[in-house]
Structure formats: structure tokens, C-alpha cells
Amino acid sequence: MPEILKIKPTRMELLKLKRRVKLAERGHKLLKEKQDALIMEFFTIYDEALSLRRELIRKMEEAFNSLRRAQVDVGALRLKEIAIGVKPNKEIEIKTRNIMGVRVPLIEVPELKRKASERGYAFVSTTSTVDMAAEKFEEVLELAIRLAEVEESLKRLGKEIEKTKRRVNALEYIIIPRMENTIKFIEQHLDEMERENFFRLKRVKAILEARQSM
């Protein structure tokens, strides 16, 4: 006999257990639907992450090419001095949003691309190549922040998918089968009890009839 629950083999427990099986099956169905929806959402965001990563690599190549041109134009030392003088960019705000019950980051990014006059360095000390390099790296920063948001979302969704999968499997392969095995055991036990009672009553009836015929 497969593993069963440790409960009294009574009709009352049998009825309770049948109700529990129905609830477990309903829960399994809902969890499976949630798992499927999470997987679909995961791959949608995964495609976005791949696209962002490709775009980020392309933008980084452009940015470093621009940086090399600026370095040739004004020299490495002067470029470093200009970089030190750049004003910090605006702060980002990190919130969260809900995807199928999973809290994922939502990064609100202000406009990071700035005019040369907003960066804090003097016009006389720079050239168009320096401005171009700064602009390219601002684009890189925007993409990097967006990619960080998407990858963290993937990480959290992945954890929730694994968690949901474990619950689905536990219901499907352990909890529900164990309850069903217990139901079969109780039904067999009750059937056996009924048969025993039937034969006992039959014997009693036969004894009584025999006494009456004496």
C-alpha cells in the first residue's frame, strides 16, 4: 500500500478528505496557471533583456570610440580634469511594480542626456569631441540602468517560478496522491467492515432461526 495519511478510517474523515482533495486540485490548477503565466512573462522580459544588452554593447563601443577621439583631441590629463569637474547627474528613484504577485523593480530615470552647459564644465576648456563622448556615456548610463531593472526582474521572476514549480510538484506528486491513496484505504476499510457486519448479522440471524425451530 502506498503512503497514506495518519487519520481515523471513518466515514466522517472520508468526507473531509474528499473535500480536501477537491480544494487541493483547485489549488493545483490555479498554481499551474500562475506558473505558466510567469514563464510567459519571464521570456517576454528575457527577450527585452537580450535586446537591451545588445544595444548596450553597441552604445559602449560608440562611447569608448568617442572617448578615444576626445583623448587625442585634448589629451588624457586634460580629459581627466574635465571629467572631475562634471556635475553629478540627477538621482534615480527606485519603486516596485507587481507582476503576477511578484514585486519587481521599477526605476524612474530622469532625463540623463544633458546639454553641454548643464554638465558643469566650461565651454572654453572642451571641444565637440569631449561633448560627444559625454553624450555617448550618458546614453550608456540610461541603457545600463534599464538593463539592471530588467535583469533584476528576471531574477525575481525566476525565483518565483521555481517556488511555484515546487508547490505544483508537491501537490501533483505527493500531497494529492497521498490523499487519494488514503481515500482508497478508508473506502476499502469501510467496505471490509460492512462485509464483516453483514456476515456477523447473517450468523446471528441463522442462530436465532435455529433456536426458534427447536
Swiss-Prot record:
Principal location class: membrane
MF terms in GO: ATP binding; proton-transporting ATP synthase activity, rotational mechanism; proton-transporting ATPase activity, rotational mechanism
A Pfam family: ATP-synt_D
Keyword Ion transport among UniProt keywords: yes
Membrane topology listed for this record: Peripheral membrane protein
Subcellular location(s) per record: Cell membrane
Listed transmembrane segments: none
GO CC entries: plasma membrane
Keyword terms, alphabetized: ATP synthesis, Cell membrane, Hydrogen ion transport, Ion transport, Membrane, Transport
Family label: Belongs to the V-ATPase D subunit family.
Subunit structure: Has multiple subunits with at least A(3), B(3), C, D, E, F, H, I and proteolipid K(x).
Function field: Component of the A-type ATP synthase that produces ATP from ADP in the presence of a proton gradient across the membrane.
Name under which the protein is recorded: A-type ATP synthase subunit D
Gene source species: Pyrococcus horikoshii (strain ATCC 700860 / DSM 12428 / JCM 9974 / NBRC 100139 / OT-3)
